[in-house]
Amino acid sequence: MKLFDYAPLSLAWREFLQSEFKKPYFLEIEKRYLEALKSPKTIFPKSSNLFYALNLTPPSAVKIILLGQDPYHSTYLENQQELPVAMGLSFSVEKNAPIPPSLKNIFKELHANLGVSVPCCGDLSAWAKRGMLLLNAILSVEKNKAASHKRIGWEAFSDQILMRLFEANAPLIVVLLGKVAQKKIALIPKNKHIIITAPHPSPLSRGFLGSGVFTSIQNAYREVYHKDFDFSL
């Protein structure tokens, strides 16, 4: 079986990225990911959500990109069942999962900047459906092992996604939180897109709270689309 048998990808994205899927680097990603999936190891997010970020936001609908690093590797208990926190969207978690510290800080800053009510759950899929691509640079992870799939090769694929979007859609609002995400600035054509940077929202990082990042995003969105982005959840 092929990757897309385990991890569905929408027709719009398959057409948009068609030439990538036969390249040696992608075939190697497919091989390594399927090997991990078939091993005794537990891989997050569940394979059906591997491309959830892409499936929720078609290429033609992308207006904002919020780039993450890799999926959450932890679990939570629901009805005595251990479930993955990761759901395939950067920074987002399953509806009933506890809200992680980074996401709590995102909600705090959003409230401080724009007065948006702090939601009771951490599912950001509503943002994705409104045109915010919540893409992780690395799309999978082994349970309880942060950055464990760094060597699978996902970053080559996510870089291609970004570069194709930068060519096709203009102007995009590209939000890069933290030093790892900000390395992607080199991929962004100058003077074509709006780049917004801030420290990573992790409590281990300093400077995110008070950065005004959501004010910057909203101002940029108004400039491009002449209306507000709806941040409500």
UniProtKB/Swiss-Prot annotation:
Q: What is its main location?
A: cytoplasm
One Gene Ontology cellular component annotation? cytoplasm
* Active-site residues per Swiss-Prot or TrEMBL entry: 70
One GO MF term: uracil DNA N-glycosylase activity
What is one process in the GO biological process aspect for this record? Answer: base-excision repair, AP site formation via deaminated base removal
> Matching Pfam families, A to Z?
UDG
Which protein, by its recorded name, is this?
Uracil-DNA glycosylase
Q: Which organism is it from?
A: Helicobacter pylori (strain HPAG1)
UniProt gene name: ung
